[in-house]
């Protein structure tokens, strides 16, 4: 379940069958609820304080949102080269089918999130599911190529 920002959201997500939580920020009550219920959680963390709190909960895979608006790959490199070298990231916010590619080349970025595979060429609006397949395949090929070039 995405955008889990309260315990109530988390409870509703579990009732709906969610297998994990994604949150735009780090809310201690939500993290504690997730851990107590054995639910994986991907909290959004963009400050050294957020990251430190997450690590103290035993969470080292974090969401960085919004990545471009808050410094992009340079910010991640500063964190990785400093005290947070053991953190891995999922980056979201402001990404599209082209500007996500630099993140595909970074070992400590596990994934990028965005709606471009569905939004480009009006795929969802037009209910053009074949276009979604084309967009998704193109994205996968771009990632594979970016990782191969390294």
Identify the residue ranges that each predicted region occupies.
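C-terminal helical cap(s) of enzyme catalytic domains, especially alpha/beta-barrels
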Residues: 34-39, 122-150
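Hydrophobic faces of well-ordered beta-strands that scaffold small-molecule active sites
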Residues: 1-2, 21-23, 41-44, 62-64, ...
């Amino acid at each position: 379940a995405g955008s889990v920002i309260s315990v109530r959201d988390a409870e509703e997500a579990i009732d709906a069958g969610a297998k994990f939580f994604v949150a735009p920020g780090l809310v201690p009550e939500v993290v504690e609820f997730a851990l107590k219920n054995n639910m994986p959680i991907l909290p959004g963390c963009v400050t050294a304080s957020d990251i430190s709190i997450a690590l103290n909960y035993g969470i080292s895979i974090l969401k960085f949102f919004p990545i471009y608006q808050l410094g992009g790959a340079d910010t991640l490199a500063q964190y990785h080269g400093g005290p947070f070298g053991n953190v891995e990231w999922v980056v979201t916010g402001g990404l599209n089918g082209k500007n996500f590619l630099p993140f595909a080349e970074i070992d400590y970025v596990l994934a990028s999130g965005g709606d471009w595979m569905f939004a480009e060429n009006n795929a969802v609006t037009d209910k053009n599911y074949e276009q979604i397949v084309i967009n998704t395949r193109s994205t996968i090929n771009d990632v594979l190529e970016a990782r191969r070039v390294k």
